[in-house]
């Protein structure tokens, strides 16, 4: 049976290092463990998970899934690209699917350069600071859009 809702969960640079990189900031779970937890928490959703260290690969993936059709939205942790990637911002603007920006840490409690997001204005919302739950809240936000 085909799932009624398909979502892309997309992660940017350095998120492949979760579980090893600054666990006091990002937690001790690996990205694979986070992805498995998302899939278990939302069995009614068909997920595609994607991570790249490269800006262009994230942009290509957004365009690819829109071209394929059938996706209801994107949960995006763009990592450091959040703060400077105009190209990613433009790609988010170019797709018709809703995108939720998520961050494991509360970026506003961290270094000043992390306080500015160039992608927030083209996302439907931003969730930050709840650890792994940030991803779950992002999924819930996208699923709830059908009830509005």
UniProtKB/Swiss-Prot annotation:
Q: Tell me the Gene3D superfamilies matching this sequence.
A: Dehydroquinase, class II
Under the heading InterPro entries, the entry gives:
DHquinase_II, DHquinase_II_CS, DHquinase_II_sf
- Name the domain of life: Bacteria
> Catalyzes what?
3-dehydroquinate = 3-dehydroshikimate + H2O
Q: Where is the active site?
A: 26, 103
The residues listed in the UniProt record as binding substrate, with positions renumbered to this chain, are: 77, 83, 90, 104-105, 114
Alphabetized GO MF terms: 3-dehydroquinate dehydratase activity
Site note Transition state stabilizer applies to: 21
Q: In which pathway does it act?
A: Metabolic intermediate biosynthesis; chorismate biosynthesis; chorismate from D-erythrose 4-phosphate and phosphoenolpyruvate: step 3/7
**Entry's transmembrane regions:** none
Under Enzyme Commission nomenclature, its number is 4.2.1.10
Per the record, the GO terms for biological process are: amino acid biosynthetic process; aromatic amino acid family biosynthetic process; chorismate biosynthetic process; quinate catabolic process
Q: Which UniProt keywords apply?
A: Amino-acid biosynthesis, Aromatic amino acid biosynthesis, Lyase
Per the entry, what this protein does is: Catalyzes a trans-dehydration via an enolate intermediate.
* Quaternary data: Homododecamer.
Q: Which family does it belong to?
A: Belongs to the type-II 3-dehydroquinase family.
Question: What is this protein's record name?
Answer: 3-dehydroquinate dehydratase
């Amino acid at each position: 049976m085909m799932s009624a809702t398909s979502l892309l969960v997309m992660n940017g640079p350095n998120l492949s290092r979760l579980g090893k990189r600054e666990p006091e900031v990002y937690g001790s779970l690996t990205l694979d463990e986070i992805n498995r937890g998302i899939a278990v928490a939302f069995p009614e959703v068909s997920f595609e998970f994607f991570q790249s260290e490269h800006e262009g690969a994230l942009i290509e993936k957004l365009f690819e899934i829109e071209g394929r059709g059938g996706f209801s939205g994107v949960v995006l942790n763009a990592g450091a690209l959040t703060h400077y990637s105009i190209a990613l911002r433009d790609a988010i603007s170019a797709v018709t699917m809703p995108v939720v920006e998520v961050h494991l840490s509360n970026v506003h409690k961290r270094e000043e350069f992390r306080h500015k997001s160039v992608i927030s204005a083209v996302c439907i919302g931003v969730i930050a600071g709840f650890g792994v739950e940030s991803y779950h809240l992002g999924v819930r936000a996208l699923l709830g859009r059908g009830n509005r």
